[in-house]
From Swiss-Prot:
GO MF entries: urocanate hydratase activity
Catalytic reactions on record: 4-imidazolone-5-propanoate = trans-urocanate + H2O
Listed HAMAP family: HutU
Family: Belongs to the urocanase family.
Primary enzyme class: lyase
Chief place of localization: cytoplasm
Residues binding NAD(+): 58-59, 136, 182-184, 202, 207, 245-246, 266-270, 276-277, 325, 495
The protein's name in its UniProt record: Urocanate hydratase
Required cofactor(s): NAD(+)
GO cellular component terms, A-Z: cytoplasm
Location within or outside the cell: Cytoplasm
Entry keyword set: Cytoplasm, Histidine metabolism, Lyase, NAD
Pathway given in the UniProt record: Amino-acid degradation; L-histidine degradation into L-glutamate; N-formimidoyl-L-glutamate from L-histidine: step 2/3
Length: 564
């Protein structure tokens, strides 16, 4: 055990965590080694935003409640038997119970509050008392893979924007955005992959430098003029990290009559206390004020967000394709008096929902061996099994060429109900026959078709008005537990902040066994199928057609499906 050198039990600057590589186990089987390695991988300094504070990404999205809890989780996973299940309550290991070999080895509930109390004020009180932890989406569920985790979804969105607004031609066009954190850091690479140039405004210079080192951003600028010159002088799409505050830069562009082609934002606006720097403040002032007067910080941050959103609306009025990228900044601005904050759409209803209707979403896998060759072999297997999707092949080629692995090698690849189970079975077979050096884990973001209720993001503007119904992610978590996922998580507040979302995650370990094959056939079919079910239930024709093709049994719709 390491002695803590700070009164905050969540902070220990002496710790450096990296997942083990190779085939030597610290746990009793791969089913418990897998969550152990992925927990540790979440805190790898090449992966996490602030690993010494257990913060993985997204403001204060943590992997464990404090270092004592982290150490105890590791200790339990090392001794856990294959007929036991560990329960984790907001980053704290609270119980080990007898189950069976096909049950999940870990069940996780993070940040869940009774709805009346589901707000940042109450959460922050509990967090200060050490009674809760913000799990974000993949931070507290141990399946974060670095910025790659959102690159493809962002790339798909930018491709869709190009098709909708620019006849599919992004070259010569540029995107304005804010935020280069764990999620926002994916934007510059995704933009240039899709053919756009980008100026990404970031107030923390260390984040720009990190994205430069890892190849996610091409250049750094300290003024609007410098950034604009870089874009104009480049013959090919280029991304620029602009040091500044989005609440200053966005309105300055309006004043100077500079209109980007596309405008969005991925600052951590979902968390006004910890995630957004108020206009005119330094990082140091914000850190100090948080310890003195939290309400003052929140108010100043939300007022600054209102200024930024007003500028986004002004740029939209001038012709920029403007879209909310799911950080709840419109809601924050609305609460500060910007009455038309929702005049620009969220990215899911605007561009992603047709994919969700077919259960297509951010399928991801990581090589527990730590060997990049295992990922390259699985890339090839995906191409073999899905031969007639040139867009997907292009993504895999670009990902191999341009995305640096962070921590354990991993890949993200948007596929749906028709393909997830097939890919999982193929990967399991590759482990069984020794093509891969060690097992792989398959998971996904909580941003998926059947696993989230978030009225300002994934379920915004559902055609039947069921945006806020959160039975669906609960059913998804229950079904993945029943199906035998290796670990299952149920969270609140990810992406958009407290009170605005509920969502679930699952990870399954492909260890090459017959038992794993049977679990894969259940979990990797059922998980995306809940998304098709949810969208079919809401009335989407694409989802109904997919349900019919995939022979889903949806009692209230079966008669209608037979007539299709």
């Amino acid at each position: 055990m390491t002695e803590h050198h700070n009164s905050d039990p969540r902070l220990d600057t002496t710790r450096e965590i990296r997942a083990p590589h190779g085939t030597t186990l610290r746990a009793k089987s791969w089913l418990t080694e897998a969550p152990l390695r992925m927990l540790m991988n979440n805190l790898d300094p090449d992966v996490a935003e602030h690993p010494h504070a257990l913060v993985v990404y997204g403001g204060i999205g943590r992997a464990a409640r404090d270092w004592k809890c982290y150490d105890k989780i590791v200790e339990v996973l090392e001794r856990l038997e294959d007929d036991q299940t560990l329960l984790v309550q907001s980053g704290k290991p609270v119980g080990v119970f007898p189950t069976h070999k096909n049950a999940p080895r870990v069940l996780i509930a993070n940040s869940n509050l009774v709805p009346h109390w589901a707000n940042w004020e109450h959460f922050n009180e509990l967090d200060k008392e050490g009674l809760m932890m913000y799990g974000q989406m993949t931070a507290g569920s141990w399946i974060y893979i670095g910025s790659q985790g959102i690159v493809q979804g962002t790339y798909e969105t930018f491709v869709a924007i190009a098709k909708k607004h620019f006849q599919g031609e992004a070259n010569g066009k540029w995107v304005l955005t804010g935020g280069l954190g764990g999620m926002g850091g994916a934007q510059p690479l995704a933009a240039t992959m899709a053919g756009f140039s980008m100026i990404a405004v970031e107030c923390d210079e260390s984040r720009i430098d990190y994205r430069l080192r890892t190849g996610y951003v091409d250049r750094k600028a300290t003024s609007i003029d410098e950034a604009m010159a870089m874009i104009k002088e480049s013959d090919t799409p280029i991304s620029v990290g602009l040091l500044g505050n989005a609440a200053d830069v966005f309105p300055e562009l309006v004043e100077r009559n500079i209109t980007p082609d596309v405008v969005t934002d991925q600052t951590s606006a979902h968390d006004p206390l910890n995630g957004y720097l108020p206009q005119g403040w330094t990082m140091e002032k914000a850190a100090q004020e948080r310890t003195i007067d939290e309400a003052k910080v929140v108010k100043a941050a939300k007022q600054s967000m209102a200024i930024q959103v007003q500028a986004m609306l002004d740029l939209q009025y001038r012709g920029a394709a403007t879209v909310d990228y799911g950080n709840n900044i419109r809601q924050m601005a609305l609460e500060e008096g910007v009455e038309n904050a929702f005049d620009f759409p969220g990215f899911v209803p605007a561009y992603i929902r047709p994919l969700f209707c077919e259960g297509v979403g951010p399928f991801r896998w990581a090589a527990l061996s730590g060997d990049p060759e295992d990922i390259y072999k699985t890339d090839q297997k995906v191409k073999e099994l899905i031969p007639d999707n040139p867009h997907l092949h292009n993504w895999l080629d670009m990902a191999r060429e341009r995305i640096q692995f962070q921590g354990l090698p991993a890949r993200i690849c948007w596929v749906g109900l028709k393909d997830r189970e097939r890919l999982g079975q193929a990967f399991n077979e590759m482990v069984k026959n020794g093509e891969l050096k060690a097992p792989v884990v398959i998971g996904r973001d909580h941003l998926d078709s059947g696993s989230v209720a978030s009225p300002n993001r994934e379920t915004e503007g559902m055609m039947d008005g069921s945006d806020a119904v959160s039975d669906w992610p609960l059913l998804n978590a229950l079904l993945n537990t029943a199906g035998g996922a290796t670990w299952v998580s149920l969270h609140h507040g990810g992406g958009v902040g407290m009170g605005f979302s509920q969502h679930s995650g699952m990870v399954i370990c492909c260890d090459g066994s017959e038992d794993a094959s049977q679990r894969i056939s259940r979990v990797l079919h059922n998980d995306p199928a809940t998304g098709v079910m949810r969208h079919a239930d809401a009335g989407y024709d694409i989802a109904k057609q997919c349900a019919k093709e995939q022979k889903l049994d949806l009692p209230m719709l079966n008669e209608e499906l037979r007539r299709l």
